[in-house]
Amino acid sequence: MPKKCGATNKGKNQSKEPERPLPPLGPVTVDPKGGVSIAIHAKPGSKQNAVTDVTTEAVSVAIAAPPTEGEANAELCRYLSKVLELRKSDVVLDKGGKSREKVVKLLASTPPEEILEKLKKQVEKK
């Protein structure tokens, strides 16, 4: 049956709220399975281990180990486990084994807000 002339779709699409832009995602994210991931910008070969900056893209971490044979990756996981007060086995390198841009996955069930807070406290200690 053809539509009547001048008929409008009253009531349809009226309940839709205007789309709000999503808040910027920080370096700490939760994947669909519930695991927590941290985007890391590693700086190997530094004098000492330190969280140098927390931006919306990544957490900058200076690592006091050379970037050879995975030494810096192992030291990064060890240092983050100490900072986040987790077991070493709960901090695993997920992506970026040969890159400065890395993703570290946390196997412990810790809220992302708490993780971000602990990382920001380390930046303030500098």
Swiss-Prot record:
Pfam families cross-referenced by the UniProt entry: DUF167 (PF02594)
Any GO CC annotation of this UniProt entry: cytoplasm
Keyword match Cell cycle: no
Region (Disordered) residue spans: 1-33
Keywords for this protein: Phosphoprotein
Family annotation (InterPro entries): DUF167, YggU-like_sf
Highest taxon in the source lineage: Eukaryota
Keyword Phosphoprotein: yes
Positions of post-translational Phosphoserine modification: S89
Family affiliation: Belongs to the UPF0235 family.
Full protein name: UPF0235 protein C15orf40 homolog
Annotated source species: Bos taurus
